[in-house]
A protein has these predicted regions:
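Flexible phosphate-sensing "switch/lid" loops adjacent to ATP/NTP-binding sites
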Residues: 1-263, 270-282, 288-290, 296-303
């Protein structure tokens, strides 16, 4: 939920935490909302009787949304889904047109692909990634960087990257391997190390970024502290913990500042009991929608 009350994709919360920004509903562009606005404009006669089409009308709306959301020196645009998905074609076309309008030298295309590892044959399979990149080139977009997601904690041999570089036409330094890490806060460190030369060339700034705070975050998340705190989270939507991800991540950061380890104990807002509240060190009562669980939240606040 953004500061202006919009319910958006979970990814927007990651951007807020990692970039230390407050985002709004303008930063989340949804096809359904754009189509609704297009239909409303057509019904109001704003197109003068023209036939409203995905190209150019929807693509123009997407480009306008990108411009309206842009407020910084660097603007990050993420297109969800998979290359070739029918529902995402208008967004791919819009971003192609966008790069031509602002200048190709001002755009850096990053394509994330998945390279599976087959345990039976003990080899990485790059064919799905090659096909995805061929599809992307077919839409008129040549990636500058290919981020290769793989399973396991070790990166594939360099031969895999070389194979992808040859098949895609991307420079070898533009192929970055992204294996699993034990904490998400190590990802910026990995990207800065692997992608530094490409970003320096793109931005014209070869000054190495100060990654001290990221190193501290990664160290905190990997470290085990002796002092432990149990926080009771009185929640309505306990079936999906990601609903409260911003809160749980904030609690972790607060605990790290006090060199402590935090354990989240989920308490159903509809079945709050004194016994459940008595076992925790502190209670957090987050916001919610509707009447369900309100009495339990009030009871939890009263207990404290």
């Amino acid at each position: 939920v953004t500061k202006d009350g919009a319910e958006t994709d979970l990814d927007l919360g990651h951007y807020e935490r990692f970039l230390d920004l407050e985002l709004t509903q303008r930063n989340a562009t949804l096809a359904g909302r754009l189509l609704r606005d297009l239909i409303a404009d057509e019904r109001a006669g704003k197109f003068g009787g023209q036939t409203v089409q995905l190209v150019p009308h929807l693509t123009q709306a997407i480009k306008r949304a990108i411009h309206q959301a842009a407020a910084g020196q660097v603007h990050i645009v993420e297109i969800g889904g998979t290359v070739g998905d029918y529902e995402g074609l208008s967004f791919v076309e819009a971003i192609r047109e966008f790069s031509l309008e602002v200048g190709r030298e001002h755009c850096l295309f990053v394509h994330v692909v998945y390279v599976p590892f087959l345990a039976t044959s003990q080899e990485y399979k790059t064919k799905p990634a090659q096909n995805a990149m061929a599809d992307l080139r077919g839409f008129g977009i040549m990636p500058d960087v290919v981020a290769v997601r793989t399973e396991g904690s070790t990166a594939p041999p360099r031969g895999v990257a070389d194979k992808i570089a040859i098949a895609s036409g991307v420079r070898p330094e533009g192929i970055i391997m992204m294996p699993n890490v034990d904490t998400v806060y190590k990802v910026p460190l990995m990207v800065a190390r692997e992608l530094g030369p490409v970003l320096a060339s793109f931005t014209g700034n070869d000054t190495a970024p100060d990654m001290t705070r990221w190193q501290q975050l990664a160290r905190h998340d990997s470290q085990t502290y002796r002092q432990r705190l149990t926080i009771g989270l009185v929640a309505k939507y306990i079936d999906n913990a990601d609903t409260y991800l911003s809160i749980t991540e904030a609690l972790k950061a607060a605990a790290w500042a006090h060199r402590s380890e935090v354990t989240i104990q989920w308490i159903n807002a509809e079945t709050v009991t004194d016994a459940a509240l008595s076992t925790v060190d502190a209670v957090v009562v987050p916001g919610g929608f509707g009447k369900r669980g309100v009495e339990g939240k009030i009871a939890a606040a009263s207990y404290c």
